[in-house]
């Protein structure tokens, strides 16, 4: 895959500088309709640099599509990640989330802040307290989602072309792996607590991505002096379209190698 140019605008963080050869623990949280397979190219690259990396799949999605797909909620998915981190015995976790995964990561931080050292949102939702993912969308999109809620049906994925995926190889790779999203996961509000002082916060905007809701989130993050921001010149699924740039951005934000 060709690597597109990357532009990063990193703001100073009040935390201590981290050694570039320090070993980190990364838990990568995929977005909606996907699974742990979304990190197929990023996870090995981080492991090759000596880091611990896991890519859990959320209930009802990916290879877990047979499990509670109709009834899973956002709380279910938050519990997936909380339990994963606790059962693995992880501490000082860098939690990397993409798209819907930002809702899950935010809820996870509220549950186990003592186990998290850093949050990286990759073109992800960063909810405000008491808001659901649907609240972030336009009225037109909300009406579309409401149809599935009213009919108690899971929500089919967006067309890959809408997400900027046009490479035939990527289309062939992704199409059989996409799974309908349990509608309850998008409608449940999330509890957001103030970010603990010890947790580093970063937001990455994919500049060719869909959705002005991500632009609004980026604007909000840019105004926060405690959030480091970066951009990648690619579409919404940066970990598949430009995995090298995605890895570099993650490592630069964490100031590690």
Which sequence ranges carry the predicted segments?
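Short beta-strand/loop motif that positions the catalytic acidic residue
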Residues: 203-205
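Gly/Ala-rich beta-loop-alpha elbow adjacent to hydrolase catalytic centers
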Residues: 97, 101, 105
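Short beta-strand immediately N-terminal to the catalytic nucleophile in serine-hydrolase-like folds
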Residues: 95-97, 122
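Active-site loop/oxyanion-hole signature of alpha/beta-hydrolase fold enzymes
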Residues: 52, 58-94, 110-111, 135-138
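Flexible "cap/lid" loop of the alpha/beta hydrolase fold
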Residues: 70, 110-111, 115-116, 120-156, ...
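Active-site nucleophile elbow and catalytic-triad environment of alpha/beta-hydrolase enzymes
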Residues: 176-193
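Conserved loop-alpha-helix segment in the C-terminal half of the alpha/beta-hydrolase fold
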Residues: 207-240, 245, 252-253
